Amino acid sequence: MQKKIETVKTLLDSLPFIRKFYGKTIVIKYGGSAQIDERLKESFAIDILMLYMVGIKPVIVHGGGKRITEILTALNVKTEFKDGVRVTTAESIKIAEMVLSGEINKEIVNMLNQHGAKAIGINGKDMSFMKAKSLVGYTGEITSIDGVFVNKLLSESLIPVIAPIAAGDSATHPGYNINADTAASEIAAAIDAKRVIFLTDTPGVLDKGKNLISSLTKEEIEKLKQDGTIAGGMIPKVDAALRAVERGVEKAHIIDGRIEHSILLELLTSEGIGTEIKES
């Protein structure tokens, strides 16, 4: 009986957060270990289904860089990075789209639908809802997003699962590979999402003593970047989070995707588990 009481108490504790997010859109960048480990995949699917069933509208933007590198290596196609950004060539853009849209996207959609959700897989070429220009080679910089298209899918009670491939400027253009963190940030702003969550392989933003910083503002982030506390691979994630907040998303969250049910723990508990980023 005590266990049943504790279960009910947990549900009641989450009620204020469910009420706050009911009918609101949450964009989730899905990547890292959470996208590879079978146990974490299952946890992720259950979290998304939970949000969906209580009236919250999840949108998933996924990466797939490791898998793309594996396929390129197997095909003896050289992989080059410039300032931490993959240089996508005319040859590798076709492989990137094959992996992101044809393999990973379909796997996520199937996983969610097997759990009872109504997910649909798309990329930026569908309705040309996400367009880009060249940043370096066929790695792109987003120029426009049709938020109406994504919101239409949400209004039909669908969960959009978005592969970060953007349309080019002509019918024959092969498209652009987009950084998934950037895509999640830009999509969140374009569809007026309430929150954007980045799943990572770190607890969040850490101070110099390797302790989690639970909350950061724009001003605090700039100071931490200047003194080297925020460095390396965390810089683009923080920049993407901050970009979303600057464009109207209420808060961004950088959380540890290696923890089971990390999304629910961040959104539906008072303490959260990661770093929340707000403008001020």
Swiss-Prot record:
GO terms for biological process: arginine biosynthetic process via ornithine; L-arginine biosynthetic process. Its main location: cytoplasm. SUPFAM superfamilies: Carbamate kinase-like. Keywords: Amino-acid biosynthesis, Arginine biosynthesis, ATP-binding, Cytoplasm, Kinase, Nucleotide-binding, Transferase. The keyword Ion transport does not apply. The record marks 29, 237 as: Transition state stabilizer. Pathway: Amino-acid biosynthesis; L-arginine biosynthesis; N(2)-acetyl-L-ornithine from L-glutamate: step 2/4. GO terms for cellular component: cytoplasm. It is an enzyme of class 2 (transferase). Substrate binds at residues 64-65, 86, 177. One of its GO terms (molecular function) is acetylglutamate kinase activity. Its EC number is 2.7.2.8. This is Acetylglutamate kinase. It comes from Nautilia profundicola (strain ATCC BAA-1463 / DSM 18972 / AmH). The lineage of its organism: Bacteria, Pseudomonadati, Campylobacterota, Epsilonproteobacteria, Nautiliales. The gene is argB.
